[in-house]
Amino acid sequence: TAKKCAVVIATVHGDIHDIGKNIVKLLLENYGFNVTDLGKDVPPETISAAVVKLHAPILGLSALMTTTVPSMEATIKLLRKDAPWCKIIVGGAVLNKEYADKIGADKYAKDAMGAVRYAEEINLQYQADL
């Protein structure tokens, strides 16, 4: 089997919750993805730099607090400028599909398996483009 694409994941700046992100990371790794976990409370610039360095086709962002959603939006804006190829999956208790659309995410994952299913779709496109 071809190696699956790189995925960068992080909990956005200002948010210290990482249980959900950690579950997504474990599942993605179980499905064969090469996951770079930047941790929690990660500034937008750090996330963008990692995606660019790895040329990662997938970024997963997590936020659990309503106060950190603007940080998620700022991260997405920066990614659109620095890494326009990257597909952005967002998740967390304070998010829903409508909000994910509003802040410019490509996909809202209501649970960890939703994130994995979308990553699998992106990986198929990525492999086809190689």
Language-model segments: residues:
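Long, charged amphipathic helices and adjacent flexible linkers at domain junctions
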Residues: 1-10
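Short glycine-centered, acidic/aromatic-flanked micro-motifs in structured strand/loop junctions
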Residues: 9-12, 61-63
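C-terminal amphipathic alpha-helical interaction region
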Residues: 12-18
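Cofactor-cradling patches in redox/metallo enzymes
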Residues: 21-31, 35-106, 111-120
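A charged, well-structured terminal subsegment
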Residues: 118-130
